[in-house]
């Protein structure tokens, strides 16, 4: 796993990832990262915090909200708890946030906003994994179906009711944009929950989200690809030998065996999956660095208007 948090710009494939600040001592993504001082603000005006940026406040509101705590009892793959080892959507969201902060830091993006979107990205999921969402979508078909991203927006803009002055968490435009669009532009007929809020506070749903939100989306992919393997091995749904038949994972196991020939089963599989995890993170950083260097964005709006994602796998 990558340990440093800044990259010398642009990424140079001949020397690999290098970390640090630019020649003027400033993070390289400064021009196109989301600046909290330039935020488009909240739907309901609030006094600024003495100690926290607006994105930090968003993150803290998400962590302390009821919906975030309820993620403890929701899963992605397994339909019910079969022990305390398997991931829940709460532990998954924490892992996504960790990966997202690392990538954002390397690319010079705003790590606070990236972490905030990562922590919020699963708030709209129902219980019982993907099967639960499919069942709920079928039941809600007469009312427009069910969409977990739209439900997440509904939760943070309406259903959380703790504050005296407004319903919801009154998050910044940038955080709401990231929750709604981290997987890309929202096209076609809008779910009513998203359409209702968008009429009040236009999230520009047809465009791409900030690079910070895009990082959160890819961090989600990295986290679940990695922990699904951990959980699947623990549940004995497949074996390490079956995983080693896959070329990328085969190289990970081979590297571990070459360096640590006498590891026990548990340590061997953990070391191999650590390497797989690192490969995914470094791939996103390398490809995204190249994309950003090619685009040479001068501000965050250049990212939104790019016409394609800037944060990608190879």
Language-model region placement:
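Post-HEXXH active-site segment of zinc metalloproteases
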Residues: 116, 127-142, 234-238
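Leucine-biased recognition of intrinsically disordered, low-complexity hydrophobic segments
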Residues: 2-3
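Histidine-centered, transition-metal-coordinating active-site segments
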Residues: 8-93, 98-103, 112, 132, ...
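Active-site nucleophile and cofactor-binding loops and adjacent substrate-binding regions
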Residues: 143-148
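Acidic, glycine-rich active-site loops and adjacent beta-strand->loop/helix elements
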Residues: 119-123, 140, 159
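Short active-site segment of divalent metal-dependent hydrolases/proteases
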Residues: 120, 124-128, 223
């Amino acid at each position: 796993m990558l340990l440093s948090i800044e990259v010398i710009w642009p990424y140079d494939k001949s020397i690999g990832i290098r970390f640090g600040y630019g020649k003027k001592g400033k993070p390289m993504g400064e021009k196109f990262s989301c600046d909290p001082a330039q935020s488009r603000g909240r739907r309901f005006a609030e006094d600024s915090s003495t100690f926290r940026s607006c994105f930090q406040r968003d993150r803290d509101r998400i962590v302390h909200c009821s919906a975030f705590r309820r993620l403890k009892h929701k899963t992605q793959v397994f339909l019910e708890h079969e022990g305390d080892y398997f991931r829940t959507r709460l532990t998954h969201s924490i892992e996504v946030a960790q990966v997202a902060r690392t990538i954002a830091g390397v690319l010079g993006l705003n790590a606070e906003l990236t972490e905030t979107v990562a922590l919020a990205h699963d708030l709209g999921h129902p219980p019982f994994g993907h099967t639960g969402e499919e069942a709920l979508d079928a039941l809600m078909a007469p009312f427009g179906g069910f969409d977990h991203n739209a439900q997440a927006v509904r939760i943070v803009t309406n259903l959380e009711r703790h504050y005296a002055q407004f319903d919801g968490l009154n998050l910044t435009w940038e955080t709401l944009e990231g929750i709604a669009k981290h997987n890309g532009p929202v096209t076609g007929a809008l779910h009513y929950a998203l359409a209702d809020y968008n009429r009040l506070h236009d999230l520009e749903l047809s465009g791409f989200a900030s690079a910070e939100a895009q990082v959160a989306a890819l961090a989600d992919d990295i986290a679940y690809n990695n922990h699904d393997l951990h959980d699947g091995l623990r549940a004995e749904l497949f074996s390490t030998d079956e995983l080693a038949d896959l070329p990328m994972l085969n190289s990970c196991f081979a590297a571990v065996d070459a360096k640590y020939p006498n590891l026990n089963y548990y340590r061997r599989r953990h070391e191999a999956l650590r390497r797989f995890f690192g490969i995914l993170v470094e791939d996103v950083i390398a490809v995204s660095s190249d994309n950003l260097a090619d685009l040479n964005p001068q501000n965050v709006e250049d990212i939104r208007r790019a016409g394609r994602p800037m944060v990608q796998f190879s």
